[in-house]
Swiss-Prot record:
It is an enzyme of class 2 (transferase). Its EC number is 2.7.11.33, 2.7.4.28. ADP binds at G152, V153, S154, R155, C156, G157, K158, T159. This is Putative phosphoenolpyruvate synthase regulatory protein.
Length: 272
């Protein structure tokens, strides 16, 4: 079955998209065509949105699923005239919260993502800059300021994981690629020894690593299965020898990898 899904907001659309994606992921037998539509903040835009939804309904033969975080009642009423199944995220969850807290919500657009109301904005930017500045072992003299240091073979997912933790949680994460020389010595490089308590290892299935490296350097020793299998085996031996906690990243999303790392290392998120 194929269905269309719209994530509609009068702000960035981040909330509607994040929650909507999580809910749709529970239906593995349905194929969704997904459309994010931020800043639907006027009745004119809402009417144009209704046309898009109705076209999708006619094309699919099923009414689209609509996740919205629209604040303006007039705009919501226009969207409700479409041939779509609407899930109003704010009204669904805010009403019972208001009852439980005996407090009316501000119901304001972009509340959780606006710079003016988010004291964590600068921490997020600083964490991202830290991840970029300390990527791929480029610098090691700032490791004393790191919350975490990810280690592993080249192209096993260290960089995207560091950036995700920086963006989402303000975690200052560096990453260091272990080289063939490190593997042969079966000991940590000098730059990492003083920070062993911050280390977390990522490993990966050799066949998956081969596929990833072939996209970057096809038909090279670097991307050969034999080389990938050797590096993964030796790095896992090093992790066990040095008692470094680690996980296999092959079958996990960056979100899942990040959550597992934070739990395993007991690192507190700077913001949630």
């Amino acid at each position: 079955m194929k269905r269309s899904a719209f994530f509609i907001s009068d702000g960035t659309g981040i909330t509607a998209e994040t929650l909507g994606q999580s809910l749709l992921a529970q239906f593995e037998n349905v194929t969704f065509s997904k459309f994010t539509r931020p800043y639907i903040d006027s009745m004119e835009k809402a009417r144009a949105m209704v046309q898009q939804i109705n076209i999708a309904a006619e094309k699919d033969g099923h009414r689209p699923i609509i996740f919205d975080t629209i604040v303006n009642q007039d705009i919501r009423e226009i969207l409700a005239t479409s041939n779509g199944f609407m899930i109003d995220i704010f009204s669904t969850f805010l009403a019972p919260l208001e009852q439980e807290l005996s407090e009316h919500s501000s119901y304001s657009v972009g509340k959780s993502h606006s710079i003016g109301h988010n004291s964590n904005y600068m921490e997020r930017i600083e964490a991202v800059n830290f991840a970029l500045d300390n990527d791929d072992g480029a610098r090691t003299h700032y490791y004393d300021k790191a919350d975490l240091i990810l280690v592993g073979v080249s192209r096993c997912g260290k960089t995207p994981t560091c950036l995700y933790m920086a963006m989402q949680f303000g975690i200052r994460a560096a990453n260091y690629p272990l080289t063939e020389e490190d593997m042969e010595r079966l000991q940590l490089p000098n730059a990492l020894r003083a920070h062993k308590h911050k280390l977390f290892g990522l490993t990966i299935d050799p066949d998956r690593l081969t596929a990833i490296r072939n996209e970057r350097k096809p038909n090279s020793r670097y991307s050969s299965y034999a080389q990938c299998e050797f590096e993964v085996r030796e790095v896992e031996n090093l992790f066990r020898r040095e008692n470094i906690p680690h996980i296999n990243s092959t079958h996990f999303s960056v979100e899942e990898i990040s959550a597992k790392i934070l739990v395993e290392k007991g690192v507190e998120r700077r913001f949630k």
